[in-house]
Structures are given as C-alpha cells and as structure tokens.
Amino acid sequence: LGGLSKKAWQIRRISTEQQKPSLFVDSGNLLFKQVQLPDGPSQELLTAEGIIKIYRTMKVDAVAVGPLDLASGLGILTHSRQQGFPWLSANLVDEEGRPLFAPMLIKETGNIKAGIIGLTGAVTSLPPGVTLADWRTLLPALLEETSAQSDILILLSSLSPAENQEIARQFPALHLILAANQHSGNMMPEQVKNTLITQTATQGKYQGILTIDWHKSGRWGKTQGTELTELRNRIGALDWQLQRMRRRVDLQQPDYLDKIKLVEQDREAVIRQVKELEQALAADHSDGQNAACTFNHNFLALERSMAETPEIRAIITGIKEQIQALHASRIRKDVDIPLLGHKGCMSCHQAQ
C-alpha cells in the first residue's frame, strides 16, 4: 500500500517531464493477495477500499478485474463501479450471460483513440451467480466492435501466458496485451505477430512504463531510418565478401562460381529492399501511412527513498488509522475477571 504514493509521484513526474498524452491502466489482481476472504470487516477489505480511493485520485483510465479482485465477492467491485471506477471484464457474466462489468471502453489520448478490453483469468471460486465465459467465443465480435472505434487496440488480461500467446497469434489486429499473471515478474515486451505482450511484476514493487511512437500503419517494427541504415550496411558487407571471394585461386571452379553468384543475388535483393524502403520513406514524409510504430519500455523500481505524493500519503495514513481502530475494537480491554477464592473452588473440587 505504501508504494502507491511513490507510484503516484512517479506517474506525475513522468507526465510533466514528457509532456505527452498518456494512459494509466492496470490489468488486475489489484485489491487482494489471496483468493478468498472471510465475511465481515477486515484489514484486507479496508486496504482494498483504500486502493480504489487512491486509484480514483490518481485518475486511473481502466482496470481489468483479476481473479484475486473477486476474493471478497462482488460487493466492493459493484459499489466502486457504481461510483465510476473503470472496472473492465468482458468474460465475467451473470447466469443469463450478461456482462457484470463494461467489456471495453474507448479512451482518447491526444489525437489517438485507444480501445481497451478487459479479460479475467481463471477463478478458483466464483461468487454466486457469476460465470466465467469462454473468451474464445466472445472476443472475435468484441475486437471487431472495438477496432471500428479506435486506432490502437489494448487488452488488459489476467489470463495465462499460453492464452495470451494464443490470442496474439489468432488476432493480429490486437496491438498490445498488458498481462497480470500472478506467477510472472517483469516481462520484457515480446512481439507475437503484430501484438506486443508485456507485464509488470506483482505487489506494486515496480512501475511499468511503455512509451509508444504510434503511426497510422498500426504495424510494430523498427524505424524505417534504422532499417535503411542496416540494409545499407548489409550491402557494404556483401561487397567486401564478394571482393574476397573473387581473389580466390579456385575462381574457375564451377561450384565456387555458383557460390559467388548466390552472394551477388543476395546483394541485388538487398539493393531492391533499399530502393523500396527509400520510396516508402518518401511517401511517409507526406502522409505517414507506412511508418512503423515503435516503443521503448522501463520497469521503474519503487524504492523507499523516492519522493511521495502528499495527498496519496494522507489517504494511506487514514487507511492505517482505520485498520488500527478495527484491531482495537477486537481487543477486550479492562475486563474484570472475578477471583473465585477457595469457596468458589469447593463447588467443583473436594477439599483436600
């Protein structure tokens, strides 16, 4: 809980320094550390209510419902949703198959519309009347609907790593999967077809930062300038290789001449790639349609020495005071226990 004031300060600092449009999202398993809680007031429930209050103060854009978020049932989730907390889950449904939370939302950041979908992973014990629908059934239509309204498609997922990989392979229109797997730590962005998959370690020890240079192509890749430089360097390397090969004494051997021919063909193919890329770059200068989308990432460790946001620190202090009051109410103080004396003992024990 204490790390949230540092997280808030870092998010504010980065937003101020970069002066770029941004989204603050969470893929779930936010509220609790165990799969189920007993009924009634508890330290865990007070902490969860505090986390929701802090995230609202931090103006979170979207949070997917994770399995651990259901540890105390639907009550805290439903209440906070009614107050405007942006819970998402496309596959948590009631007995009639109706979503219990918004399946997706569209957030506009700068001049880009981000379509954000939430999927909940396997739940050990579902609350009464709640069903976990198969994402394979509902996701195709939901992606089509969301894609029509957005420029970039983002999935907040607490599904297993294997399922996230399956989604990336099956739905290349999805640009980004932010995972919340309980057993994984910080995950470097991995590209599967045209989908990036990444996640930040659990328990709020790190702040994950993904900076995206987005273009209309919606295609991840190197910058075309970098790719062009690499191709030109490749031509230089092939030229050097051909010079060495042509100096060989066995130049008249048919097999060796065939090897030279293959390298020459490789060089010609790279030259064609360079010309095509130069043409694409010229077109990008006019409309930017073909430019690749690029990114960089950082996992920022939230250390004790970091600065904190005062308003968040005040909320945390209030939560701790509520927890102390809860514990105090459970301790019986100043209870008089009468001294029985020998007469009281004689009612049960024989005199000796």
Label the model's feature ranges.
Residues 345:
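Short cysteine-rich clusters marking metal-coordination/redox-active sites
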